[in-house]
């Protein structure tokens, strides 16, 4: 059971067994055009999930108009500005939500800034799994700030 509340997302394990989770959200943001975007608060390197290689984040984001799927180990913040819509969007996603994915799917004029607790296949390999003890809860926090630049 998942619930989104002002104080975060609460995942409740109502079983008699410890439960592993890998959790992510997929907020989509409408954009004016890919060429009008400026990204910041990102690490130097990222994982191109399509090719499964480590790459320079800025080099990859320069190809956002072609479609990207980038996983980043962030500082807990991911941001972009849309110069035409005159807005700045900041995803605040502290540990354990500090993995970030930037995803685009042209020609749709949108991007996703996604907070994740662990990368793909983590339920298989156990990397960064969160274990919720029997009859316990886990609270995850993330927020989105949208600032007008007018």
Give the residues covered by each predicted segment.
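Acidic, contiguous internal or C-terminal segments within carbohydrate-active enzymes
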Residues: 1-21, 25-27
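A short, structured loop/turn motif at beta-sheet edges
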Residues: 1-3, 31-33, 83-84, 104-108, ...
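Intrinsic-disorder/low-complexity, polar/charged segments enriched in Ser/Thr/Lys/Arg/Asp/Glu/Gln
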Residues: 4-8, 77, 86, 137-141
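Short coil/turn motifs at secondary-structure junctions
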Residues: 14-16, 32, 118-120, 147-149
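Active-site/ligand-binding surface loops and adjacent short beta/alpha elements
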Residues: 17-20, 27-94
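Surface-exposed, gly/pro-biased binding rims or lids
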Residues: 43-51, 114-132
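Glycine-rich active-site loops that engage anionic ligands at enzyme catalytic sites
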Residues: 82-120
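Short Pro-Gly-centered flexible turn/kink motifs
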Residues: 131-148
């Amino acid at each position: 059971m998942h619930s989104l509340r002002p104080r975060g997302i609460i995942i409740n394990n109502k079983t008699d067994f410890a439960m592993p989770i890998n959790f992510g959200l997929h907020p989509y943001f409408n954009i004016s055009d890919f060429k009008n975007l400026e990204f910041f608060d990102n690490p130097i390197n990222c994982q191109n999930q399509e090719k499964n290689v480590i790459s320079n984040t800025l080099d990859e984001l320069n190809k956002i108009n072609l479609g990207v799927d980038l996983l980043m180990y962030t500082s807990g913040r991911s941001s972009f500005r849309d110069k035409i819509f005159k807005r700045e969007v900041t995803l605040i996603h502290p540990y354990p939500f500090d993995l970030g994915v930037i995803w685009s799917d042209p020609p749709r004029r949108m991007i996703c800034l996604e907070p994740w607790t662990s990368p793909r296949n983590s339920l298989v390999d156990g990397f960064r799994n969160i274990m919720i003890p029997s009859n316990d809860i886990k609270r995850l926090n993330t927020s989105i700030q949208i600032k007008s630049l007018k």
